[in-house]
């Protein structure tokens, strides 16, 4: 399998080491057809985008600049903020790709949610929070499932299947096992392979994720951004 698109990459707008243009040029050099920039949303205390208007504007400009060479997707990596499924999607911006994950440095909705998502090991509650977020919001991709907080992969896979959300296989965070992916797949989930690149040189670098997908028994039809 060969990667065709990398939708989860970071730039200097959060904690990446290169600008949007550098990531895009790296994607072109890697032979990708599409590239997404998805920096951390506003309630990530350490790395959240500080000027969302400028961020979105720069991505829209890049989309126009590279038209005809590569498809550029404007993205945002949202934080799961509460057990009720609250997320920090900025209003008034039409992002092409919305990615959702649990991040330890997020500004959570309340103490109960912070405790559960930061320190809790209650798989049922955390999975429920993901499910609520998927039901209430347009979530295109679940980022690094199981990273930072335990989840029920079968239940999450079923929700992804029901709502058209993609289950990410992340090349950077390597806690996901082949059996976890297989469990999500058994519930009808579809998948996306991501580099989660924080430097331009890592854009499209997903060999680990591709090997993991193969070990889980996934076919090309189950992964949206690969081809033969």
Language-model segments: residues:
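Charged catalytic cores and adjacent phosphate/nucleic-acid-binding surfaces used
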Residues: 1-11, 20, 90, 95, ...
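Glycine-rich anion/phosphate-binding loops
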Residues: 14-20, 83-85
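Short, solvent-exposed loop/turn segments at secondary-structure boundaries
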Residues: 15-18, 46-50, 203-205
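Alpha-helical scaffold segments that flank or form the walls of functional sites
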Residues: 21-36, 57-68
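A structural signal for isolated positions on well-ordered beta-strands in alpha/beta enzyme cores
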Residues: 34-36, 71-73, 192
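Short, conserved active-site loops that position catalytic residues or coordinate cofactors/metal ions
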Residues: 35-46
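Short, ordered loop/turn segments at secondary-structure junctions
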Residues: 40-41, 103, 172, 197
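Extended substrate/RNA-proximal surfaces in nucleic-acid metabolism proteins
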Residues: 45-165, 214-222
């Amino acid at each position: 399998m060969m990667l065709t698109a990398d939708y989860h990459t970071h730039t200097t707008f959060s904690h990446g080491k290169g600008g949007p243009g550098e990531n895009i040029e790296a994607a072109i050099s890697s032979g990708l057809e599409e590239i997404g920039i998805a920096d951390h949303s506003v309630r990530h205390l350490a790395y959240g985008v500080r000027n969302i208007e400028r961020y979105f504007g720069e991505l829209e400009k890049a989309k126009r600049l590279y038209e005809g060479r590569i498809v550029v997707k404007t993205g945002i990596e949202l934080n799961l903020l509460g057990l009720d499924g609250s997320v920090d999607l900025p209003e008034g911006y039409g992002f092409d790709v919305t990615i959702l994950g649990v991040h330890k440095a997020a500004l959570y909705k309340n103490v109960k949610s912070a405790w559960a998502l930061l320190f809790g090991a209650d798989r049922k509650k955390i999975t429920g929070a993901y499910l609520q977020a998927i039901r209430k919001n347009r979530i295109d991709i679940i980022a690094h499932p199981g990273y930072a907080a335990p989840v029920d992969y079968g239940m999450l896979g079923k929700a992804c299947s029901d709502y058209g959300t993609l289950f990410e296989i992340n090349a950077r965070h390597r806690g996901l096992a082949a059996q976890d992916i297989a469990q999500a797949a058994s519930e009808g989930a579809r998948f996306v392979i991501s580099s989660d690149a924080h430097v331009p040189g890592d854009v499209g670098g997903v060999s680990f994720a591709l090997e993991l997908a193969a070990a889980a028994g996934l076919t090309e039809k189950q992964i949206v951004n690969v081809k033969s």
